[in-house]
Amino acid sequence: METAILTGAGLAAPAGLNAYIPLLVLALADRATDRVTLHGPYDAISSNVGIVLLVLLLSIEIAVDKVPGVDHINDIIQSFVRPAAGVIVALASTSGVVSISPAIMVLTGLVLAGSVNAVKVTSRPAFTFGTGGILNPFVSMAEDGIAVVTSLIAIFVPFLVIL
């Protein structure tokens, strides 16, 4: 039970940086490992269609997030998507654990992804203004890297999430 909660929380936080990386990591972990088992309706995430859709959305997100100015518009739009993705990964990670209230996981996913997203959305314009947008692609790549690493930690070493 604790592992599922930590995995859910650990996936929700990076969803605030990039909605699709934690979802894709969760889907691939369900398909390729025994670390996560998604139960209905969340098993749709790891279906062939789900994975293809996540790869497509991730590709768009990665490309758009590297362009100064466009990245800010994307961040505003994604301010609704990222917290929702945080909720989905938190719920999906704990869907097989009966003793966890879904309401707690909804709140966990919303707060963690929403908080991380709020920091991203408010700090990005400062990078754009301060550097004329030159650093935006590098900041975006760093965010993507952090999202990948923290998502993998949440799946494979969930107790590190509390650090």
PLM features: residue spans?
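Cytoplasmic-side transmembrane-helix entry/capping segments in multi-pass membrane proteins
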Residues: H72-A84, P137
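Helix-coil boundary and interhelical linker segments in multi-pass alpha-helical membrane proteins
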Residues: M1-T3, A29-V49, V89-M105, A154-I162
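Helical membrane-embedded segments and adjacent short helical loop/helix-boundary regions
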Residues: A15-A19, Y42-L54, Q78-P83
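Mid-bilayer segments of alpha-helical transmembrane spans in multi-pass integral membrane proteins
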Residues: A84-S93, P102-S123, G145
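The feature identifies polytopic integral membrane transport proteins across all domains of life
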Residues: P102-L107, F127-V139
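The first (N-terminal) embedded transmembrane alpha-helix
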Residues: L6, A12-D30
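Generic transmembrane alpha-helix signature in multi-pass membrane proteins
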Residues: G10, I88-T94, K120-A126, S140, ...
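C-terminal ends of transmembrane helices
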Residues: S59-H72, V121-T128
